[in-house]
């Protein structure tokens, strides 16, 4: 029975899953929007939201705690200095998941995960990305 077992296995080992979530968190903090499969986006959401909730406090212990999770100093700086202050008054719900159809090769459900109130200049909008993929 799976009582009280949360999370998805994503068909990888636990160390691979932890590294993948950390790398996806760095990409999301850097670009403020990433395209991935729907189950990975659903797993990334609570992971990144706890990091942002910690980053809102912005002291040395929080910095070390976040750095132990994502291991990228520039992403930690942006998380604490920019995103922590941006979402200071928001009690949660920092990300949104937008379903974006299915991948051509294996029909995996694709989704965009992005920050609410994100900086549009950090990465292009969804329509512009879709037009570039069609051209290539």
Swiss-Prot record:
The keyword Ribonucleoprotein applies. Keywords: Ribonucleoprotein, Ribosomal protein. It comes from the Bacteria. One of its GO terms (molecular function) is structural constituent of ribosome. The keyword Transcription regulation does not apply. One of its GO terms (biological process) is translation. One of its GO terms (cellular component) is cytosolic large ribosomal subunit. Gene3D superfamilies: Ribosomal protein L17 (3.90.1030.10). PANTHER family: LARGE RIBOSOMAL SUBUNIT PROTEIN BL17M (PTHR14413:SF16), RIBOSOMAL PROTEIN L17 (PTHR14413). HAMAP family: Ribosomal_bL17. Belongs to the bacterial ribosomal protein bL17 family. Part of the 50S ribosomal subunit. Contacts protein L32. This is Large ribosomal subunit protein bL17. The gene is rplQ.
């Amino acid at each position: 029975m799976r009582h009280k077992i949360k999370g998805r296995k994503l068909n990888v080992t636990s160390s691979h899953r932890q590294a993948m979530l950390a790398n996806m968190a760095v990409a999301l903090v850097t670009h403020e929007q990433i395209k991935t499969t729907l189950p990975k986006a659903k797993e990334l959401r609570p992971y990144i939201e706890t990091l942002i909730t910690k980053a809102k406090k912005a002291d040395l212990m929080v910095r070390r705690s976040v750095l132990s999770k994502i291991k990228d100093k520039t992403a930690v700086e942006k998380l604490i200095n920019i995103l922590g202050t941006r979402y200071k008054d928001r009690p949660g719900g920092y990300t949104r998941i937008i379903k974006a159809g299915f991948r051509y090769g294996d029909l995996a459900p694709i989704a965009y995960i992005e920050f609410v109130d994100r900086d549009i200049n950090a990465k292009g909008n969804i329509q512009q990305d879709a037009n570039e993929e069609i051209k290539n």
